[in-house]
UniProtKB/Swiss-Prot annotation:
Catalytic reaction(s) noted: 2 chloride(in) + H(+)(out) = 2 chloride(out) + H(+)(in)
Transmembrane segments: 125-162, 208-231, 256-275, 281-300, 348-366, 389-414, 422-442, 498-518, 523-542, 605-622
Protein name: H(+)/Cl(-) exchange transporter 5
Function: Proton-coupled chloride transporter. Functions as antiport system and exchanges chloride ions against protons. Important for normal acidification of the endosome lumen. May play an important role in renal tubular function. The CLC channel family contains both chloride channels and proton-coupled anion transporters that exchange chloride or another anion for protons. The absence of conserved gating glutamate residues is typical for family members that function as channels.
Sequence similarity: Belongs to the chloride channel (TC 2.A.49) family. ClC-5/CLCN5 subfamily.
Cytoplasmic membrane side: 1-124, 623-816
Motif (Selectivity filter part_2): 279-283
Entry-linked PROSITE patterns: CBS
Residue sites binding ATP per the record: T666, Y687, S688, G689, T794, K795, K796, D797
Source organism: Pongo abelii
Statement: the UniProt record of this protein carries the keyword Transmembrane: yes
Gene: CLCN5
Length: 816
């Protein structure tokens, strides 16, 4: 089968000669039919087809008609036919069929010549080469983002006089005047007060540093939101809800384009550096998918087939998580569990390869200078005990409650943003939230530091030489066996840190609600993990002190002896981080694997599993949707969730259009309509496709034709053949209809007709129809009764019906 020109290259074909085509109709409005009264008492003995296809003829068409005046312009591919308009859903069945035909043709030709064999081998290898390129580009961009964000975050507090391109840590690495206890202080690093007023002491110096911190934060946020607004509006947010929708078959032109990639990369650095409560991990998935989409254009196999391209995007999403967390296996599982709609075994292998290459590339760049892929990598050595499952489950309950609370409040705020004047002033909103965040963050060292550094500090297992306030314990021992420190009483620094962390927790919980969803790149992974890590560290320190002061208690004396290292507060922080992230996203398997890859400890999988499952159960009890599904519904994307069961006893006839007493279904006949008739129907309707029937009287179904293919084919015929006029007959049969002499040439369009559209009877239960739409990725399904066409069910009709059954607003299923 000939392959059509790739969808991404055909913006020009949106400019048809018909106004309705210029308006770029959505196939989700496919048959908002001005519908018809249905006569369900129609006779069963419908007369046979007017013209049966000859037994010795090919049913798929493409043959030459008997009349020498027949114009069949589809012997050669017409650019644009078989492609899709913006905000349309792809036809998964047709795309997979076209790829099988292409593969069959290449395989057959490979037996004919050496050159064809080489072409066959290169075609098979192209997928792996594409994965290699995606991994290299994603890893390189992630390294660039990490290094730039680290430097710009430190720029808010000062600058390195030994080289302005060094961040604080790198600046002091080569200094000869730094001590181990104060390794973050060196003469080469100057705060803004030292540069401006030559001193770092006193109230005025504090005010200068405070002012510069807020000023830099506002500047970075202003640049980020301005670049997004002017150059790439699609670069805002995390991108994961939209990527889920795109992977389900929806087309959003430009969302994964070159400008989006460039602006998202730049503004992600600016947004993270501004100190807002957001992360770069979610947007890195969007960046990786942009890389995958752009590189697809180098390979015809993927450029010209939307279904194959979505397999590549699934692998790119895995590479994005791989570089975000340094977790290649977790990335593959994230793509499978959270974002992918269609995930065949071949995609699993290629996703693994892309994630591996991306992680290796980032490791080679070594952005943090510690040979790790993430800033908060940590290793624990103390085993956990069975009793600790109780506080771990408590952290899971907290994570579920936080997740449900966050989703409800964030969605309410985002809905307010969409429905009020607030949404018209994205720059002001970003600047106000940034100013509030910066003003409240600077006085507290735990909110002033970047969120990744905060998580690293909370995960840290205190050693004897740690200078952090969280490790300010009273050392009441002489020796330390095996390098492990026993549980110790908390010092002044620990109590001070607890109060500061409690305030940090409150700020993070509140400010993240208003930050996620603003018109800047904003991920949710890191803020959610920070909330959980703070709660976990607070609980961990509490358990540690309880075990130290009350070792005689029954729950402790069986396993925690005097002078032993019983409780690891950093482990509680890690479990809390997993619980809160699971509560917000509802991830389970991939979340546990990502956290396991972060810590490198197999023995902590059980605590992580207990917390992740508890948080999911608690959050699901309070609301079924994760944050990404909630944003998909808020934006009205046509996404059919595969995880939800449809348990209602409705039938196809209850959902199809037209309903009883509605106008008749708009159809085309197979051989009796003129070009003018078809153009009139196209100009007067906005449907994205039309059923083709034998005749209006019989309503016997022949096939289904897409609006876009009709328009392009008719326009192409008018340009290339002088004989085609408005009175030319259009026919979809194998042979030309008998015509009187001196009639204008006919136009054969059988090759754009889908001869095997999916059909169900009017009495088919809707649970089966919903299952068909989910598993086959259909755009529409025709409804028949005894072989006669009754109506049509589109994907949007299914979504509206599901919303109606769930007592939600069915009109919210629109692309907003």
């Amino acid at each position: 089968m000939a392959m059509w020109q790739g969808a991404m290259d055909n913006r020009g074909f949106q400019r048809g000669s018909f106004s309705s085509f210029q308006n770029s109709s959505s196939d989700e409005d496919l048959m908002d039919i001005p519908a018809t009264a249905m006569d369900f008492s129609m006779r069963d003995d419908v007369p046979p087809l007017d013209r049966e296809v000859g037994e010795d003829k090919s049913y798929n068409g493409g043959g030459i008609g008997s009349s020498n005046r027949i114009m069949d312009f589809l012997e050669e591919p017409i650019p644009g036919v078989g492609t899709y308009d913006d905000f349309n859903t792809i036809d998964w069945v047709r795309e997979k069929s076209r790829d099988r035909d292409r593969h069959r043709e290449i395989t057959n030709k490979s037996k004919e010549s050496t050159w064809a064999l080489i072409h066959s081998v290169s075609d098979a290898f192209s997928g792996w080469l594409l994965m290699l390129l995606i991994g290299l580009l994603s890893g390189s961009l992630a390294g660039l983002i990490d290094i730039s964000a680290h430097w710009m975050t430190d720029l808010k507090e000062g600058i390195c006089t030994g080289g302005f391109w060094f961040n604080h840590e790198h600046c002091c690495w080569n200094s000869e005047h730094v001590t181990f206890e104060e390794r973050d202080k060196c003469p080469e690093w100057n705060s803004w007060s030292q540069l401006i007023i030559s001193t770092d002491e006193g109230a005025f110096a504090y005010i200068v540093n405070y002012f510069m911190y807020v000023l830099w934060a506002l500047l970075f946020a202003f640049l980020a939101v301005s670049l997004v607004k002017v150059f790439a509006p699609y670069a805002c947010g995390s991108g994961i809800p939209e990527i889920k929708t795109i992977l389900s078959g929806f087309i959003i032109r430009g969302y994964l384009g070159k400008w989006t990639l460039v602006i998202k990369t730049i503004t992600l650095v600016l947004a993270v550096s501004s100190g807002l409560s957001l992360g770069k991990e979610g947007p890195l998935v969007h960046v990786a998918c942009c890389c995958g989409n752009i590189l697809c254009h180098c390979f015809n196999k993927y450029r010209k087939n939307e279904a194959k391209r979505r397999e590549v995007l699934s692998a790119a999403a895995a590479a994005g998580v791989s570089v975000a967390f340094g977790a290649p296996i977790g990335g593959v599982l994230f793509s499978l569990e959270e974002v992918s709609y269609y995930f065949p075994l071949k995609t699993l292998w290629r996703s693994f390869f892309a994630a591996l290459v991306a992680a290796f590339t980032l490791r080679s760049i070594n952005p943090f200078g510690n040979s790790r892929l993430v800033l908060f990598y940590v290793e624990f050595h103390t085993p956990w005990h069975l009793f600790e499952l109780v506080p771990f489950i408590l952290l899971g309950i907290f994570g579920g409650l936080w997740g449900a609370l966050f989703i409800r409040t964030n969605i309410a705020w985002c809905r307010k943003r969409k429905t009020t004047q607030l949404g018209k002033y994205p720059v002001i909103e970003v600047l106000v939230v940034t100013a509030i965040t910066a003003i409240l963050a600077f006085p507290n060292e735990y909110t002033r530091m970047s969120t990744s550094e905060l998580i690293s500090e909370l995960f840290n297992d205190c050693g004897l030489l740690d200078s952090s306030k969280l490790c300010d314990y009273e050392n009441r021992f002489n020796t330390s066996k095996g390098g492990e420190l026993p549980d110790r009483p908390a010092g002044v620094g620990v109590y001070s840190a607890m109060w500061q962390l409690a305030l940090t927790l409150i700020l993070k919980i509140v400010i993240t609600i208003f930050t996620f969803g603003m018109k800047i790149p904003s991920g949710l992974f890191i803020p959610s993990m920070a909330v959980g890590a703070i709660a976990g560290r607070l609980l961990g320190v509490g358990m540690e002190q309880l075990a130290y002061y009350h070792q005689e208690w029954t729950v402790f004396n069986s396993w925690c002896s005097q002078g032993a290292d019983c409780i690891t507060p950093g482990l509680y922080a890690m479990v809390g981080a997993a619980a809160c992230l699971g509560g917000v996203t509802r991830m389970t398997v991939s979340l546990v694997v990502i956290m396991f890859e972060l810590t490198g400890g197999l023995e902590y999988i059980v605590p992580l599993m207990a917390a992740a499952m508890t948080s999911k159960w608690v959050a699901d009890a309070l609301g079924r949707e994760g944050i990404y599904d909630a944003h998909i519904r808020l934006n009205g994307y046509p996404f059919l969730e595969a995880k939800e069961e449809f348990a209602h006893k409705t039938l196809a006839m209850d959902v199809m259009k037209p309903r009883r007493n509605d106008p008749l279904l708009t159809v085309l006949t197979q051989d009796s309509m003129t070009v003018e008739d078809v153009e009139t129907i196209i100009s007067e309707t906005t449907y994205s496709g039309f059923p083709v029937v034998v005749s209006r009287e019989s309503q016997r179904l022949v096939g289904f034709v897409l609006r876009r293919d009709l328009i392009i084919s008719i326009e192409n015929a008018r340009k290339k053949q002088d004989g085609v006029v408005s009175t030319s007959i259009i026919y979809f049969t194998e042979h030309s209809p008998p015509l009187p002499p001196y009639t204008p040439p006919t136009l054969k369009l059988r090759n754009i007709l889908d001869l095997s559209p999916f059909t169900v009877t009017d009495l088919t239960p809707m649970e089966i129809v919903v299952d068909i739409f989910r598993k086959l990725g259909l755009r529409q399904c025709l409804v028949t009764h005894n072989g006669r066409l009754l109506g049509i069910i589109t994907k949007k009709d299914v979504l509206k019906h599901i919303a109606q059954m769930a007592n939600q607003d069915p009109d919210s299923i629109l692309f907003n």
